[in-house]
Amino acid sequence: MTHPVAVKACLFDMDGLLINTEDIYTETLNETLAEFGKGPLTWDVKIKLQGLPGPEAGKRVIEHYKLPITLDEYDERNVALQSLKWGTCEFLPGALNLLKYLKLKNIPIALCTSSNKTKFRGKTSHLEEGFDLFDTIVTGDDPRIAKGRGKPFPDIWQLGLKELNEKFHTDIKPDECIVFEDGIPGVKSAKAFGAHVIWVPHPEAHAVLGDTEALLAGKGELLSSLEKLEMSKYGL
């Protein structure tokens, strides 16, 4: 079935969707949990953390595992461990080819990531081939996003589309966009934004996703990989 609305822009999440940083998050968090005799992190917990701003995710981990540390201490540990591994992250299957294809077709593309600027640079400085293709990049610590308004709120997508419209002097509407996501909070935020959602969960997450059809509610598609995207279905 062909998508009923012409797609005029594509907006992307980053972690676990374009690059394999979700696996690095799991590795480093398990190292932190092991220090306190806790863990390992299981997908029923991780699925609720995906796409959340760092402080909110950290708060939930501390509460769930009853860690005897403050949020600042937790963050300090994780940042130190993660910074050693970001340089090893790589594009997930189909991601780089999709970005190149959309650029070739002159489809405006925005990156809207919950990662802050520091983490974004650490994760992507060796992957310029793909990230230099974006027309605009919005990070989770952008001051224009009010505190407490990260995913599942739609603000980051609204800001990404606003920047695309300003750059190209267009008036693209949310329902003329596709949002690409891997996490449940991100899917909820994309739906609240009003876009069609391409949901590509981590392969190990499928057992804990719940009722995916109810979550998408006819406003999206679940794929096992970005390689499975049928461009013709969306007029791309």
From Swiss-Prot:
Family the entry assigns: Belongs to the HAD-like hydrolase superfamily.
Keyword field: Hydrolase
Organism in which the protein naturally occurs: Saccharomyces cerevisiae (strain ATCC 204508 / S288c) (Baker's yeast)
Protein name: Probable pseudouridine-5'-phosphatase YKL033W-A
Highest taxon above the source species: Eukaryota
This protein's record includes keyword Hydrolase: yes
Enzyme class name: hydrolase
InterPro entries: Gpp1/Gpp2-like (IPR045228), HAD-like_sf (IPR036412), HAD-SF_hydro_IA (IPR006439), HAD_2 (IPR041492), HAD_sf (IPR023214), PGP-like_dom2 (IPR023198)
Cited function: Nucleotidase with XMP as the best in vitro substrate. Low catalytic efficiencies of YKL033W-A observed with XMP and other substrates suggest that these could be secondary activities for this protein, and its primary substrate is not yet identified. May possess pseudouridine 5'-phosphatase activity and together with dTTP/UTP pyrophosphatase YOR111W might constitute a pathway for the detoxification of pseudouridine 5'-triphosphate (Psi-UTP) and -monophosphate (Psi-UMP).
One example GO MF annotation: 5'-nucleotidase activity
Alphabetized Gene3D superfamilies for the sequence: HAD superfamily/HAD-like, Putative phosphatase, domain 2
EC numbers: 3.1.3.96
Reaction catalysed by this enzyme: XMP + H2O = xanthosine + phosphate; psi-UMP + H2O = pseudouridine + phosphate
